[in-house]
Swiss-Prot record:
Enzyme class: ligase
Short sequence motif named 'HIGH' region, residue ranges: 36-46
Motif ('KMSKS' region): 285-289
Signal peptide: none
GO cellular component terms attached to this protein's record: cytosol
UniProt name for this protein: Cysteine--tRNA ligase
C-alpha cells in the first residue's frame, strides 16, 4: 500500500518554525524521549508528555515508518533544581522512605510502566536505565574534557559554555528565560555552566556513587540523555521529544554536550526537537514541587477510566497548554463513553452480516499493537483500508492531513466522531475507518466495552455485590407493581453514587466521585 500523500510537518524548536520532516534513514525513524526521574509517582502533567510521544510514534508508524524509540529512566543525578543545586531527588526520596534508592527506583518505575499501560501507550524499543550506563557517561565526559570544554571545581567537573559560540540555541540565546533562572554555584565561570560529574563531598553519605577520574561521585543529569541517546541512536538522529520545561536548560545542555563530544557544531543530537506544553490547573502548571499533584490513580479511584485522560490530551494541540479541571475530565469521560457506545453499536451491525462467529475476518486478524512491534504496515493498514471507496477515502485523506500537520489531533478526533455519524458510509466502511484512525488516537475503541468503563470509585459506600442485590430486589418490586418500594431502592442507589439505567443493556453504572 502506498503511503498517504500528505507530507509530515513538525514545529522544530531548534529553528522556531514548521519544517518538512524527512528521516535520516528512509527505512527507520530514530526517536528519543526524555523519561521520568523515578523518585515519585508521575503526575498527570508528566503523563501528557508520553501521550504526546505515543501519538507521534503511532502517526509515524501509520505513515509507513518503523520507529526505533528510546526512553530513559533517570534513577540518579537529577537534583531538586534543574541546574546544579539542591539534593539529588533519588537520594532525598530514599532517605524519606527509609529505603534503598534501588528499591525506590524499582517501585516508581513499575508504577510508571503501569500508568503507560493504562493509557494504552506502547513500550519503546529500548528502556534505557541511567545507572546501567555509568561507564559510558564517564567515558563521554572524559572525551569532552580532553577536547578542552571543561574545568574542575571542588564540587565536580563542569562544562564551560563560553567555549560554544551558539550555546542556547533552543532558548534563542534568551538569558531571561534560561540562564536567568539558574541558581549560581560558587566558582562557576558563567551561570549557564553545568556539572558533568558531581563529586561527593568527604562528609556526604551517598547511597549511589562511582569512582571516576574526578573522584567518587555521580553523573550530572544532562549528561545522561546525551550518552544514552547517542549510544542507541547515533550521533545525529531524527527526533528528540520532551516537556517544554526542558527546552531552556536541559535540552540546551544536551546539545552543548553533543557538539563538544563530536567536535561538530552541526551535530545537535537530533534534527527535530519537539516539546509538549504544560498541563495547568487553577493554580498554574501541575508540578510535584507544589507538594500536591494528581496522578492517574487519582482518576481511577474517582471512578474515571484512564483513557478519559487520553481523550482530554487529544482535545488540545501538544504545543498548547491543556487545562485540567473536574468539568474537563468528566466531559472527556462522557466523550469516551459515547464513542464506545457508538462503536459497539456499529460492530453489532457489521457482525449481523457475518454467519460464522459474528466477527469479520479482517477484524479478527487485526492486532492494533502488532504494528508497533515490527509488523508490516502495508499488511495492517491494507487489511483495513483496501475495500474503502471514494467517500471513505476522502475522509481518510482529511484525517491524514490533520495528523501529518504537526500532529493536529484536536482536528483528528472530531473526524472519527464525524465518521460514526456519516450516513453515506456503509457500517463496515465506518468500522474500517475507525480502526485505521484509532491506530493513531490509541483509544482501543474496537475492544473497549461499556462494562470496562464502569469503575467503582474507591470511596463508594456499596460494593458491587450489594448493588446487584438491590437491583434484583428492585426488579422484583417492579414485577409486583410495588413502585413506591422500587423508587425507594432507586433513590438509595442514587444516593450511593449509582445511576440506574432502565432500558439500557448495561443496567446501571457508577457515578464518578471527584474529591480532588
Amino acid at each position: 500500500m502506498a503511503k498517504p500523500s500528505a507530507p509530515v510537518l513538525f514545529f522544530n524548536s531548534l529553528s522556531k518554525k514548521i519544517e518538512n520532516f524527512t528521516p535520516i534513514d528512509p527505512e527507520r525513524v530514530r526517536l528519543y524521549s526524555c523519561g521520568p526521574t523515578v523518585y515519585n509517582f508521575a503526575h498527570l502533567g508528566n503523563l501528557r508528555a508520553y501521550v504526546f510521544t505515543d501519538s507521534l510514534r503511532r502517526m509515524l508508524n501509520w505513515k509507513g515508518y518503523p520507529v526505533n524509540h528510546v526512553i530513559n529512566i533517570t534513577d540518579v543525578g537529577h537534583l531538586t533544581s534543574d541546574s546544579d543545586t539542591g539534593d539529588d531527588k533519588m537520594e532525598a526520596a530514599a532517605h524519606k522512605a527509609q529505603k534503598t534508592i534501588w528499591d525506590v527506583a524499582r517501585f516508581y518505575t513499575e508504577a510508571f510502566w503501569s500508568d503507560l499501560k493504562n493509557l494504552n501507550i506502547f513500550n519503546p524499543t529500548i528502556w534505557s536505565i541511567a545507572t546501567d550506563h555509568i561507564e559510558d557517561m564517564i567515558a563521554f565526559a572524559r572525551k569532552i574534557e580532553e577536547a578542552g570544554f571543561t574545568y574542575q571545581l571542588d564540587s565536580g567537573l563542569y562544562f564551560d559554555t563560553s567555549r560554544l559560540k551558539e550555546y542556547g540555541l533552543l532558548a534563542g540565546h534568551r538569558e531571561a528565560e534560561g540562564v536567568g533562572r539558574i541558581e549560581t554555584v560558587a566558582g562557576k565561570k558563567h551561570p549557564a555552566d553545568f556539572a558533568l560529574w558531581r563529586r561527593s563531598s568527604p562528609d556526604e553519605k551517598r547511597q549511589m556513587e562511582w569512582i571516576s577520574p574526578w573522584g567518587p561521585g555521580a553523573p550530572g543529569w544532562h549528561l545522561e540523555c546525551s550518552v544514552m541517546s547517542m549510544k542507541y541512536l547515533g550521533e545525529q538522529f531524527d527526533i528528540h521529544t520532551g516537556g517544554i520545561d526542558h527546552r531552556e536548560i536541559h535540552h540546551c545542555n544536551e546539545i552543548a554536550q553533543n557538539q563538544a563530544f563530536t567536535g561538530d557544531q552541526q551535530k545537535t543530537g537530533a534534527n527535530f526537537w519537539l516539546h509538549n506544553n504544560f498541563l495547568v490547573d487553577r493554580s498554574g502548571k501541575m508540578s510535584k514541587s507544589k507538594g500536591s499533584f494528581l496522578t492517574l490513580s487519582t482518576l481511577i479511584e474517582a471512578g474515571i477510566h484512564p483513557l478519559a485522560y487520553r481523550v482530554l490530551c487529544l482535545s488540545a494541540h501538544y504545543r498548547s497548554e491543556l487545562e485540567f479541571s473536574p468539568d474537563n475530565i468528566l466531559a472527556a469521560l462522557t466523550r469516551l463513553k459515547r464513542l464506545v457506545i457508538a462503536v459497539g453499536q456499529l460492530k453489532k451491525k457489521v457482525q449481523k452480516k457475518v454467519v460464522a462467529d459474528g466477527e469479520p475476518d479482517w477484524l479478527r486478524a487485526f492486532d492494533e499493537r502488532s504494528f508497533s512491534k515490527g509488523a508490516p504496515l502495508d499488511y495492517q493498514r491494507g487489511l483495513i483500508e483496501a475495500p474503502l471507496k471514494k467517500e471513505a477515502l476522502a475522509i481518510l485523506e482529511r484525517f491524514d492531513q490533520a495528523v501529518s500537520n504537526d500532529l493536529m489531533l484536536p482536528q483528528a478526533l472530531p473526524l472519527l466522531e464525524e465518521t460514526l455519524g456519516n450516513k453515506k458510509l456503509q457500517p463496515e466502511e465506518q468500522l474500517r475507518l475507525i480502526a485505521s484512525m484509532d491506530m493513531i488516537l490509541g483509544l482501543n475503541l474496537l475492544h473497549l466495552d461499556r462494562a470496562s468503563l464502569n469503575i467503582r470509585p474507591k470511596n463508594a459506600s456499596l460494593q458491587e455485590n450489594n448493588v446487584l442485590a438491590l437491583l434484583e430486589e428492585r426488579q422484583l418490586k417492579r414485577k409486583e407493581k410495588d413502585f413506591a418500594a422500587s423508587d425507594a431502592i432507586r433513590n438509595r442507589l442514587s444516593e450511593a453514587g449509582i445511576d440506574v439505567l432502565d432500558g439500557d443493556p448495561l443496567g446501571w453504572e457508577w457515578r464518578p466521585e471527584w474529591n480532588a
